């Protein structure tokens, strides 16, 4: 492991809650429905993040907890039962219904696990009911996916068939390209979790080799290990370097030579390096500060330093699983500072003192920092954009070069005007 400085902070934090992950999960599994048990604030958050009007009947909704529910003057379980019945009568195509806890439901100790169990007995397998927490008390926004996948693992049947399981949501076109590369390598049995249909859960067992596509799935990994799966240790497939080592790790697990991997991906690498150059010209030598929100921060920092030659000031991450991130940390330069957790006021003080060229942060901090003359990039964009893989390296770099390019244009126009 490289000589990295690890620190831990506690205090006030500024992050989205785990409900936000519903935005990409409901698109991934169109036969599923996500029912948040929460407040009107929860409903507004998801609707705004998804950019979908509620009358368009998206595959998510909110069972609103009113003041009488929070005060204990009504039986919230009965009300939830009624809402579920109404929902299923209107949307008979639902195959899996996720009951998603929120801050309000956690506060009043609403037992969604028991509710899901009762509903499963009543509907006798016609619809599967699972539950997880998206509460901001417990989770940051990407951890919502971790909770959802963990909830699905008990539904996955056993199998001793040898397979590669890609774990973590990917854009469909990125997933298709990955599977094509694996087929060319000779790994034909490749499945994804979550699948594109909630009813098509992969079977798992001792011959299942798990390759993570996202770094925020600690609980999911632990439960897959308990089911006998082998976890392949690898960096994450962001950028040329991370993606190459990711493919090499998979090939090694299936006893495929590194020579064959390089033979297949070399054309992709050549094209990606060429496409990366224009962004590298802008990013090279720029100073970067990453505030914690998505758990993608370490992988992004590795890519931006090693492939775009940015200078790292500080990498913040909400949580740090050193086992999952070991291969990423090994690729960081010596003396890199990683801060787990957050005391937002102290971190903002360090940002102002360092005066970086670019800050990766949550939406709530971006505008105030921009007002102080500091260029920012929303970290949530990394989750909504197809950034994985060798051929997406230039697009990933472009997300960071864009605000710097914009800043250069605005500065030059200001100088001309003056």
From Swiss-Prot:
Pathway: Porphyrin-containing compound metabolism; chlorophyll biosynthesis (light-independent)
Source species, domain of life: Bacteria
EC number: 1.3.7.7
Cofactor(s) the protein needs: [4Fe-4S] cluster
One GO molecular-function entry: oxidoreductase activity, acting on the CH-CH group of donors, iron-sulfur protein as acceptor
InterPro entries, per the entry: LIPOR_BchN/ChlN, Nase/OxRdtase_comp1, Protochl_reductN
Sites where the protein binds [4Fe-4S] cluster: 17, 42, 103
Cofactor binding note of this UniProt entry: Binds 1 [4Fe-4S] cluster per heterodimer. The cluster is bound at the heterodimer interface by residues from both subunits.
Reactions the enzyme catalyzes: chlorophyllide a + oxidized 2[4Fe-4S]-[ferredoxin] + 2 ADP + 2 phosphate = protochlorophyllide a + reduced 2[4Fe-4S]-[ferredoxin] + 2 ATP + 2 H2O
Pfam families: Oxidored_nitro
GO biological process: light-independent chlorophyll biosynthetic process; photosynthesis, dark reaction
UniProt entry keywords in alphabetical sequence: 4Fe-4S, ATP-binding, Chlorophyll biosynthesis, Iron, Iron-sulfur, Metal-binding, Nucleotide-binding, Oxidoreductase, Photosynthesis
Function: Component of the dark-operative protochlorophyllide reductase (DPOR) that uses Mg-ATP and reduced ferredoxin to reduce ring D of protochlorophyllide (Pchlide) to form chlorophyllide a (Chlide). This reaction is light-independent. The NB-protein (ChlN-ChlB) is the catalytic component of the complex.
Annotated family: Belongs to the BchN/ChlN family.
Subunit and interaction comment: Protochlorophyllide reductase is composed of three subunits; ChlL, ChlN and ChlB. Forms a heterotetramer of two ChlB and two ChlN subunits.
NCBIfam families reported for this sequence: DPOR_bchN (TIGR01279), PRK02842.1 (NF002768)
Protein name according to UniProt: Light-independent protochlorophyllide reductase subunit N
Originating gene: chlN
């Amino acid at each position: 492991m490289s000589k990295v400085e690890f620190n831990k902070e506690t205090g006030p934090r500024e992050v989205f809650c785990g409900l936000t992950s519903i935005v990409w999960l409901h698109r991934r599994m169109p036969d599923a429905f996500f029912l948040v048990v929460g407040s009107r604030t929860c409903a507004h958050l998801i609707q705004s993040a998804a950019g979908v009007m509620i009358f368009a009947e998206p595959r998510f909704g909110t069972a609103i907890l009113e003041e009488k529910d929070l005060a204990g003057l009504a039986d919230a379980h009965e009300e939830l039962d009624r809402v579920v019945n109404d929902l299923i009568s209107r949307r008979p195509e639902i195959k899996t219904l996720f009951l998603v806890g929120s801050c309000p439901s956690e506060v009043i100790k609403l037992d969604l696990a028991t509710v899901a169990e009762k509903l499963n007995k009543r509907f006798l397998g016609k619809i599967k009911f699972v539950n997880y927490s998206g509460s901001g008390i417990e989770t940051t926004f990407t951890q919502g996916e971790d909770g959802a996948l963990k909830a699905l693992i008990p539904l996955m049947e056993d199998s001793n068939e040898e397979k590669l399981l890609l774990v973590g949501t990917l854009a469909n076109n990125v997933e298709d390209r990955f599977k094509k590369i694996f087929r060319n390598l000779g790994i034909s049995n490749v499945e994804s979790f979550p699948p594109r249909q909630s009813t098509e859960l992969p079977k798992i067992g001792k011959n299942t080799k798990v390759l993570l596509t996202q770094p925020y799935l600690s609980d999911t990994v632990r439960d897959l290990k308990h089911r006998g799966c082998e976890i392949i240790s690898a960096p994450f497939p962001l950028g040329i370097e991370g993606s190459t080592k990711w493919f090499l790790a998979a090939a090694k697990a299936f006893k495929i030579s590194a020579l064959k991997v390089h033979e297949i991906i070399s054309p992709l690498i050549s094209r990606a390096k060429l496409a990366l150059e224009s962004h590298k010209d802008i990013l090279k030598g720029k100073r970067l500060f990453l505030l914690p929100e998505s758990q993608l921060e370490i992988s992004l920092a590795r890519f931006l330093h090693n492939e775009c030659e940015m200078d790292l000031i500080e990498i913040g991450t909400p949580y740090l699983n050193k086992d999952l991130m070991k291969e990423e940390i090994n690729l960081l330069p010596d003396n890199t500072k990683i801060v787990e957790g957050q005391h937002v006021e102290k971190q903002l003080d360090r940002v102002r003192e360092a005066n970086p060229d670019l800050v990766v942060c949550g939406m709530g901090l971006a505008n105030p920092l921009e007002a102080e003359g500091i260029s920012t990039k929303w970290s949530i964009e990394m989750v909504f954009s197809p950034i994985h893989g060798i051929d997406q390296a230039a697009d990933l770099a472009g997300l960071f070069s864009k605000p710097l390019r914009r800043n250069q244009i605005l500065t030059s126009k200001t100088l001309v005007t003056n």
